[in-house]
């Protein structure tokens, strides 16, 4: 049977033109592949949360849909139209959702009456996300009624629980539009893991609703669960999260959509080599300016971890522990500069460090005070990374062969210290380490290998499981991806495995290193969107067929 294809896709996410986490990368890297298939008929909808400022990821085009925007304004919708500044430059609409807060209670009441969604226990970001979601759905409805008709095959695709209210609104008010929901991580699964509960050992004993009550997550659990129940096609990003959906949301997914990568982000060889040298030189300068130690390119390994600041879930704690153990391993053949590139409650760039870095040629032989972080933090005394480093005695003394630095900011090229984007820094690495305890997919290891940096991850990450499947066995660093076995309780073994892998890699000769880097690049090419986009069209087909059946009865 020939698959149905959408004429238009409206895709909403809090991270459209709003770089917060991994979902931004999912959508931004996939955009070009969809643009090539259906140019300017994939329309992304994101939050206009920049106020009077302009989003650095959005290029406004006031002429785009000018006639519709007048109608939208009459309907109380304040939108900006333009292009998302990513490869493919897809159409993007940013909507101001603040005007709907005054209608919040009426919106939630309708949600309860029609779909049984409990918003009474809402707190934190629930209201903000829900009002955006409502606004995004209203934008889609308005655009549809202005330009389209029931003859068009239209998809409304929401990402994460934050878009659930909008999906249910479309289901209610625009049933001729097919709906699709992707959970990139169940909110209750992430919460169980983040609250130091053993997610995996007792997995089949967990009841999602019961755990939501215990962890004060009732409203997020409710909107996510009911959206999964009513949507035309329910999807997630990995087999491990598909198990979560079935167990904690009581709804098996229809399709698994593994996250791909668009390697147009990766520079060509000559530019790549130039940027790699620049990145390493900058990292060495930063480390010298902080500690007074000097670093030789042939005798220094750069190792990093990155991601959102979830100490246990992202494995930041076990990364710190593994680097600490490395300090006492006499088999280590090189110096190690280890970086934790995780945004925290950053106050400002260290002025003493900035002053030193302004001298591009001077080599320093004395350390700065407390040379462990590149930026000042609010409430440094309660920061978990700094606290763990202090407890372990990791002070980056000048003569320590292993040094760990906390880079607590978004690497967007304007942090005040490194002033390079994440992609322009990561290619300076020798290894990347992502020892996640909870990781539905894991974009960071995929990004690493795409930039020819071998990585260490775990079999609790969707990407790690996928890599094992591709390789046919547990991956090794020689093959570009070392996949470490991780459970609820083997923290110490994981720390040892990471430390030992770094030691082993430090002994590689030039030929072995080149082979490992080549293998990393090769495995990344098996995860290109050109290979994975077929799963999306499978999901679109499922959703469209259900919508067509509804149209027959309208």
Language-model segments: what does each one mean?
Residues 1-554:
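Catalytic cores of nucleotide-sugar-dependent glycosyltransferases that transfer UDP/GDP/TDP-activated
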């Amino acid at each position: 049977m020939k698959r149905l294809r959408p004429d238009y896709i409206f895709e909403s996410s809090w991270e459209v033109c709003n770089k917060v986490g991994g979902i931004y990368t999912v959508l931004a890297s996939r955009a070009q592949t969809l643009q090539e298939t259906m140019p300017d008929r994939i329309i992304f909808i994101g939050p206009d949360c920049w106020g009077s400022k302009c989003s650095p990821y959005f290029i406004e085009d006031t002429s785009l849909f000018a006639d519709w925007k007048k109608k939208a304004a009459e309907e109380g919708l304040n939108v900006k139209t333009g292009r998302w500044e990513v490869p493919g430059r897809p159409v993007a609409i940013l909507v101001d959702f603040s005007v709907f807060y005054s209608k919040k209670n009426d919106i939630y009441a309708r949600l309860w009456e029609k779909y049984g969604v409990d918003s009474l226990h809402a707190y934190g970001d629930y209201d903000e996300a829900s009002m955006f979601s409502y606004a995004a759905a209203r934008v889609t409805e308005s655009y549809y009624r202005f330009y389209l008709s029931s003859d068009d095959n239209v998809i409304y695709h929401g990402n994460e629980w934050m878009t659930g209210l909008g999906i249910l609104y479309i289901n209610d008010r625009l049933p001729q539009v097919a709906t699709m929901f992707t959970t990139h991580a169940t909110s209750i699964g992430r919460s169980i893991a983040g609250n130091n509960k053993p997610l995996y050992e007792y997995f089949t004993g967990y009841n999602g609703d019961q755990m939501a009550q215990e962890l004060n997550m009732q409203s997020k659990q409710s909107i996510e669960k009911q959206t999964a129940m009513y949507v035309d096609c329910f999807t997630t990003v990995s087999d491990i999260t598909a198990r979560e959906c079935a167990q904690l949301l009581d709804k098996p997914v229809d399709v698994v959509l593994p996250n791909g990568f668009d390697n147009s982000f990766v520079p060509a060889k000559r530019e790549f080599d130039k940027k790699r040298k620049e990145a390493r030189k900058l990292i060495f300068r930063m480390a010298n300016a902080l500690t007074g130690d000097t670093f030789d390119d042939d005798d220094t390994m750069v190792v990093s971890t990155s991601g959102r600041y979830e100490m246990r879930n992202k494995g930041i704690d076990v990364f710190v522990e593994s680097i600490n153990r490395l300090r006492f391993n006499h088999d280590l053949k090189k110096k190690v500069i280890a970086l934790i590139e995780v945004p925290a409650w950053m106050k400002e760039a260290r002025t003493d460090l900035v002053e030193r870095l302004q001298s591009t040629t001077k080599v320093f032989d004395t350390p700065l005070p407390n040379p462990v972080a590149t930026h000042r933090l609010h409430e440094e005394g309660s920061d978990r990374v700094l606290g763990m480093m202090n407890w372990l005695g990791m002070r980056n003394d000048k003569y320590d062969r292993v040094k760990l630095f906390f880079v607590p900011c978004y690497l967007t090229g304007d942090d005040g210290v490194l002033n390079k984007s994440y992609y322009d820094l990561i290619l300076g690495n020798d290894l990347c380490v992502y020892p996640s305890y909870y990781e539905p997919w894991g974009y960071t290891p995929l990004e690493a290998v795409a930039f020819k940096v071998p990585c260490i991850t775990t079999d609790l990450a969707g990407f790690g499981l996928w890599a094992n499947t591709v390789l046919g066995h547990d991956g090794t660093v020689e093959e570009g991806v070392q996949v470490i076995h991780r459970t609820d309780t083997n923290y110490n073994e994981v720390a040892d495995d990471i430390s030992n892998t770094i030691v082993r890699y430090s002994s590689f000769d030039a030929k072995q290193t080149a082979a490992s880097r080549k293998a990393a690049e090769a495995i990344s090419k098996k995860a290109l969107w050109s290979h994975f986009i077929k799963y999306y069209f499978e999901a679109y087909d499922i959703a469209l067929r259900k919508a067509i059946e509804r149209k027959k009865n309208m």
